């Protein structure tokens, strides 16, 4: 079996039917013409935010990471492992793709520990066992994995989806693409940066060009590139016609170098 490709979905993608239609059409085309197995990892911040707003619960973020108090983890689990995950499975079904919905704890695929008490139920992801997902891939399934994990003590944890995708890529020896709302990392003039090293990233963070959630994304990608020993792509889901080329390893966004 070829080494898998993990496609991490993020941003408002889950909120846009048009975007999901484009993405799944590209996935169908890719699966028809290539033998390479695919895995989807997703967060669903927009789904969570909508739910929290509807329940009048405050959304608190610290250094770009969502703080998850004990009284909110059940709600966030429901939004990510429930609504967001099953929405993606429904789209797969609509496109005749045999998909299986998972969370990080299934088959111990990704090990999760609590990041820090001050973040509450926020988990740190580490590589786990490839057995379950490899078995699904060998049988032609598309695993769709939410970024909810569980600790050895049985505590549910909300994991940053970029970091969850990195840990799963390390588990499977997979390549990784982080798909988001932006077409890559932009410089101070709004132009896409084709390649990024750790030194360049540090410089842009110091200059205030890379900020907030993008810092988390860039650090996750740098961490992924270092962990995996291969480049990681940050790209946009908005340009469906470019997705098959991107899945084939053509750089379309910002390529993060190890």
Swiss-Prot record:
Cellular component, GO, one term: cytoplasm
Catalytically driven reaction(s): N-acetyl-L-glutamate + ATP = N-acetyl-L-glutamyl 5-phosphate + ADP
GO BP terms in the entry: arginine biosynthetic process via ornithine; L-arginine biosynthetic process
A molecular function (GO) term: ATP binding
Organism: Shigella flexneri serotype 5b (strain 8401)
Cited PANTHER family: N-ACETYLGLUTAMATE SYNTHASE, N-ACETYLGLUTAMATE SYNTHASE, MITOCHONDRIAL
Described purpose of this protein according to its UniProt entry: Catalyzes the ATP-dependent phosphorylation of N-acetyl-L-glutamate.
Keyword Oxidoreductase part of the UniProt annotation: no
Name of the protein: Acetylglutamate kinase
Entry keyword annotation includes Amino-acid biosynthesis: yes
Family: Belongs to the acetylglutamate kinase family. ArgB subfamily.
One matching Pfam family: AA_kinase
Keyword tags: Amino-acid biosynthesis, Arginine biosynthesis, ATP-binding, Cytoplasm, Kinase, Nucleotide-binding, Transferase
Location(s) in or outside the cell: Cytoplasm
Biological pathway: Amino-acid biosynthesis; L-arginine biosynthesis; N(2)-acetyl-L-ornithine from L-glutamate: step 2/4
Binding-site positions, substrate: 44-45, 66, 158
InterPro entries: AceGlu_kinase-like_sf, AcgluKinase_fam, ArgB, Asp/Glu/Uridylate_kinase, NAGK-NC
Subunit structure: Homodimer.
Residues engaged in binding ATP: 181-186, 209-211
Classification of source organism: Bacteria, Pseudomonadati, Pseudomonadota, Gammaproteobacteria, Enterobacterales
Sites marked Transition state stabilizer: 8, 217
EC number: 2.7.2.8
């Amino acid at each position: 079996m070829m080494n898998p490709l993990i496609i991490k979905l993020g941003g408002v993608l889950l909120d846009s039917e048009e975007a999901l239609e484009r993405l799944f059409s590209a996935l169908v085309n890719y699966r028809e013409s290539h033998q390479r197995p695919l895995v989807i990892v997703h967060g669903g911040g927009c789904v969570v935010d909508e739910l929290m707003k509807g329940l009048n619960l405050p959304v608190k973020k610290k250094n770009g990471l969502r703080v998850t108090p004990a009284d909110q983890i059940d709600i966030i689990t429901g939004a990510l492992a429930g609504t967001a995950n099953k929405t993606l499975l429904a789209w797969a079904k609509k496109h005749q793709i045999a998909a299986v919905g998972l969370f990080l704890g299934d088959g111990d695929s990704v090990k999760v520990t609590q990041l820090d008490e001050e973040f509450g139920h926020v988990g740190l992801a580490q590589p786990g066992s490839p057995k379950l997902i490899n078995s699904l891939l060998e049988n032609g399934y598309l695993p769709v994995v939410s970024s909810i994990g569980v600790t050895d003590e049985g505590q549910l944890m909300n994991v940053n989806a970029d970091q969850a995708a990195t840990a799963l890529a390390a588990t499977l020896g997979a390549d990784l693409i982080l798909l988001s709302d932006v077409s890559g990392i932009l410089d101070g003039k709004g132009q896409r940066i084709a390649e990024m090293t750790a030194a360049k990233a540090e410089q842009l963070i110091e200059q205030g060009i890379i900020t907030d959630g993008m810092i988390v994304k860039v650090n996750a990608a740098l961490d992924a590139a270092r962990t995996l020993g291969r480049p990681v792509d940050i790209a946009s889901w908005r340009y469906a016609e470019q997705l098959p080329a991107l899945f084939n390893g053509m750089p379309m966004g910002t390529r993060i170098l190890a």
